[in-house]
Design a protein with these regions (language model features):
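Short, amphipathic alpha-helical interaction segments positioned at domain boundaries
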Residues: 114-117
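A conserved beta-strand-loop-helix scaffold within acyl/acetyltransferase catalytic domains
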Residues: 2-102, 109-112, 135, 139-154
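Surface-exposed acidic, glycine/proline-enriched linker/cap segments
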Residues: 119-141
């Protein structure tokens, strides 16, 4: 997951995957809903091995999860990379279009995007008069803006 998802691996409690031979070619992760408590689960990551096409991978992994876990699911599609088509095709409903936001990336180390919540100024430099972006810039990070997200749910 860490090599094949822009945000890297996460700390989800449920990880399911599809294998071809001995290699995982597709993975999906779930956790208890973090931001919207109206939903039981959050589909937090879906990744496919680079240079690999897994036809029906999303639907097979989602079906497996739903056969083994009850409750509603929420997920978010980054509009920079997705129009949400895979969600619509699998029965999800669009519930909200979220405005653009930003993440950080340290180009000297990795291209993984790191959520801004990990770098709040009050955690990094309490009492520092510089704005958050400047604290991060001075530490070698660049601010990357996205196109917003789409929030989807399925009962």
């Amino acid at each position: 997951m860490s090599e094949n998802h822009l945000q890297g691996k996460d700390k989800s409690s449920i990880v399911i995957g599809l294998k071809f031979g001995d290699d995982f070619v597709s993975m999906m992760t779930f956790c208890k809903s973090r931001y919207n408590k109206n939903y039981m689960w959050e589909l937090s990551r879906y990744a496919v091995k680079r240079n690999t096409n897994v036809v029906g991978g999303f639907s097979r992994l989602l079906t497996n999860f739903r056969q083994n876990h009850s409750g509603s699911i929420i997920s978010y599609a980054d509009r920079s990379y997705s129009n949400g088509d895979v969600y619509y095709k699998n029965g999800f409903k669009l519930i909200k279009t979220n405005p653009p936001s930003y993440k950080y990336v340290n180009l000297g180390k990795s291209i993984k995007r790191m959520h801004r919540a990990n770098f709040m100024k009050k955690k990094l430099a309490p009492g520092d008069s510089r704005p958050e972006w400047k604290v991060m810039f001075d530490a070698g990070y660049k601010q990357i803006f996205d196109c917003g997200t789409l929030s989807f749910c399925i009962a």
